[in-house]
């Protein structure tokens, strides 16, 4: 996962039944190098100044550099796992957000999940933000669901605040209700 803060990639290996059971096996953060950070920042600035989104040669070059960085670090992450952990069923891929405006029904992430899946030879699930926006969300669906799963054993009210390029919160009321923004 990578967001608008342009700091790096967060990887998590999670074992889950897809509902309530969630076990975090490993987390790792890979900091962007200056070149990647500057390229993504330049791309965001161009789109902000132009007030429109377009894909051109520069966009595709930056996207390829970003995907190369992702693939390199997936390889490193996988190489550090034990043999029993290396069987990965799927990768949830959230590319770097370069445009995000849920009120205008738009969120664009850098990184083509089809190219990633073909390169790493593991199925990739993506496009979380846009699917959430189409369902009247704010475009940040993964973290609240994760929070609900990891705090499912407590009956206390919990608020988790994510302060990044786009801040959001998860408010868990006991074991039953989830409010997110």
Predicted region positions:
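Short acidic/glycine-rich loops and adjacent helix/strand connectors
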Residues: 1-181
């Amino acid at each position: 996962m990578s967001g608008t803060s342009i700091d790096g990639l967060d990887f998590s290996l999670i074992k889950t039944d897809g509902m309530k059971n969630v076990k975090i096996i490993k987390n790792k953060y890979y900091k962007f190098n200056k070149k990647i950070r500057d390229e993504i920042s330049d791309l965001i600035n161009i789109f902000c100044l132009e007030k429109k989104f377009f894909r051109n040669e520069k966009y595709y070059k930056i996207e390829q550099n970003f995907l190369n960085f992702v693939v390199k670090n997936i390889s490193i992450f996988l190489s550090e796992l034990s043999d029993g952990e290396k069987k990965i069923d799927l990768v949830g891929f959230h590319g770097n957000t370069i445009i995000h405006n849920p009120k205008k029904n738009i969120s664009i992430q850098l990184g083509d999940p089809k190219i990633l899946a073909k390169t790493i030879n593991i199925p990739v699930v993506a496009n979380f933000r846009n699917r959430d926006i189409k369902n009247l969300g704010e475009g940040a669906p993964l973290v609240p669901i994760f929070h609900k799963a990891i705090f499912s054993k407590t009956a206390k009210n919990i608020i988790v605040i994510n302060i990044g390029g786009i801040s959001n919160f998860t408010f868990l009321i006991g074991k039953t209700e989830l409010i997110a923004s």
